[in-house]
Amino acid sequence: MIPLKIAIAGVNGRMGRVLVEAVNNHPDTVLSGALEHSGSEALGLDAGYAVGLKTGIAISDDVDTVLAQSDVLIDFTRPEPTLKHLQKCVEKQVNIIIGTTGFDDAGKAAIQAAGEKTGVVFAANFSVGVNLTFHLLDTVARVLNEGYDIEIIEGHHRHKVDAPSGTALRMGEVIAGALGRDLKQCAVYGREGHTGPRDPSTIGFATVRAGDIVGDHTALFATDGERVEITHKASSRMTFAAGAVRAAVWVNGKTGLYDMQDVLGLNNR
């Protein structure tokens, strides 16, 4: 079997370094390119330098050259560079795995449009456990239905720049969808001062940013006399990286916009 050629954007970042290991660990993939922004001190270094691997792939800022020798790009960077990479992937018919969060509506529309021309897997979280959690939340929300106050609490490391996390927002979207609500209309982001009684139709969000928390997410359903909590805690970024590589292998040869639920076969159940 010919190995799938995977390039990584933001290879010198926290996720990028773990992705190098994940690609190296998978029996059916090989690292074909490593991207960093112009001016990065890592340019020219071996892509595996930070994790003790010798990949033979030099870190580059030449997107065109990297994509020309790759089957798929994995991108966990920021919205602006991700959208630029997305356009290049469409032009060169290279699949893309997007783990970047914080897109506005225009960015999400661009991703959706790209799915008409190449293979795109766009997910708020690539952890298998988190995606099973999404599946559970849909079931729980439908069964409990009305009468429960819903709150989502998430925590991440001090360096995370967007809040709430993409995973927390996706949890809210899943719950709202199961209840026939529009998250944009019912979400409450933080509370301060005299807020008055809680509106039972709302879904609340609370955010923690501290230390080196990789990712903690809890969905709370509370009513008089009982409380249901569904929690996922990540202790290593490898869970996200391994899921992204799994998605890259799965989307090979496909065109369309998919999420991790598709990769795991959960949308067919």
UniProtKB/Swiss-Prot annotation:
One of its GO terms (biological process) is lysine biosynthetic process via diaminopimelate. One of its GO terms (molecular function) is NAD binding. It comes from the Bacteria. It is found in: Cytoplasm. It is an enzyme of class 1 (oxidoreductase). Pathway: Amino-acid biosynthesis; L-lysine biosynthesis via DAP pathway; (S)-tetrahydrodipicolinate from L-aspartate: step 4/4. NAD(+) binds at G10, V11, N12, G13, R14, M15, E36, G99, T100, T101, A123, A124, N125, F126. It catalyses: (S)-2,3,4,5-tetrahydrodipicolinate + NAD(+) + H2O = (2S,4S)-4-hydroxy-2,3,4,5-tetrahydrodipicolinate + NADH + H(+); (S)-2,3,4,5-tetrahydrodipicolinate + NADP(+) + H2O = (2S,4S)-4-hydroxy-2,3,4,5-tetrahydrodipicolinate + NADPH + H(+). This is 4-hydroxy-tetrahydrodipicolinate reductase. The active site is at H156 (proton donor/acceptor), K160 (proton donor). The gene is dapB. Keywords: Amino-acid biosynthesis, Cytoplasm, Diaminopimelate biosynthesis, Lysine biosynthesis, NAD, NADP, Oxidoreductase. One of its GO terms (cellular component) is cytosol. Belongs to the DapB family. Catalyzes the conversion of 4-hydroxy-tetrahydrodipicolinate (HTPA) to tetrahydrodipicolinate. SUPFAM superfamilies: Glyceraldehyde-3-phosphate dehydrogenase-like, C-terminal domain, NAD(P)-binding Rossmann-fold domains. The keyword NADP applies. The keyword Methyltransferase does not apply. NCBIfam families: dapB (TIGR00036). Disulfide bonds: none annotated. It holds the Pfam family DapB_C. Its EC number is 1.17.1.8.
